[in-house]
Amino acid sequence: MTSVSDVASSTGFDWARWRRRQGWSIGVWVLLAVLIAWYTQLIPRFGTFQVASIAKNSLPLSFLAVGQAVIVISGGIDLGLGAILVLTNSVAAQLMHEQSLGMALLIAVGIVLGAAVLNGSVGWVINRSRVPDIVVTLATSFIYSGLALLVLPGPGGGTPAGFRFLFTGSESGSGSNFLPAIVMLIIPVVAVALFMRRSRTGLSLYAIGSDPNAAYLSGVDTGRAKIIAYAVGGGLAAMAGLATVAITGTGDPRFSIGSNATLNSVAAVVLGGVALTGGVGSVIGAVAAAIIVFFLSPILSAMGIDPNSAQVVQGTLIALVMMLAGLLALRRRRAE
């Protein structure tokens, strides 16, 4: 059982404990490095253009996985994050069309804050109603998807070239400049990682995920923490939506985009070492896993596997690794 005081009062550096907590995350990053090295052998002219493509196109799922990780660590799960991606993508494309970069940035800030407040209210509903997270968020996913279609009935809209450059390193959305995408990923991920491990609220989320009753008895405001977890998840899902509109240059309200993104985010969270039972894992591992989940498709394509078969292989691999990750996470939790 993990409590806030247990985590916060630790004064020495326990290498054994660190290995138990971060060993899987490190392994996921090593696996990602191996896959990239393998991919360079499959592509004859692998270079900065391919690096930029991987960096920018994995941004949406990476943001979504980090948001999902925060919620799952707190003992919940959000099946509506993918729908928030679609909704914010549609709103951004509609509002940013033919606007200046400055106005687009103001709109982006408003969208992120609005999504955080909106999803934070979902956390409040879950806490007050005691209805399981999976039921409430499944319902909100349909609400968000319907709102997306009201905002943007079909693919369309647009975004300023300067806004696209911030995420893709190119005003056209393509090119070999991968630094902007990496910077856009690192800043929020590091901020969330520090929040989870260095702030009292972040440590409270681990305590709640480990044992909500014990956390409550130790003085943790579990309701407030639940709201914050869902607010952070909503804000990061909005970041995923903004990254999507920056990459594609248009909005797309299709329901399938959101549902696929949600399932992939859950897969990335588990693959990254976060236990679905809560209280275990890190957002750093979830990022590496998200890139791997995204990366499987181009790898299978480079191997010459047809798209239909590739989807079966990809799903099977993810399922197997998720089961292994779940078993190891459970074993690690029992060891602690």
Predicted regions and their residues:
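Membrane-interfacial amphipathic/re-entrant helices at transmembrane-helix boundaries
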Residues: 1-65, 101-106, 335-336
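Transmembrane helix-bundle core of multi-pass membrane transporters
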Residues: 133-198, 225-228, 247-259, 305, ...
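Transmembrane alpha-helical segments in multi-pass inner-membrane proteins
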Residues: 237, 252-315
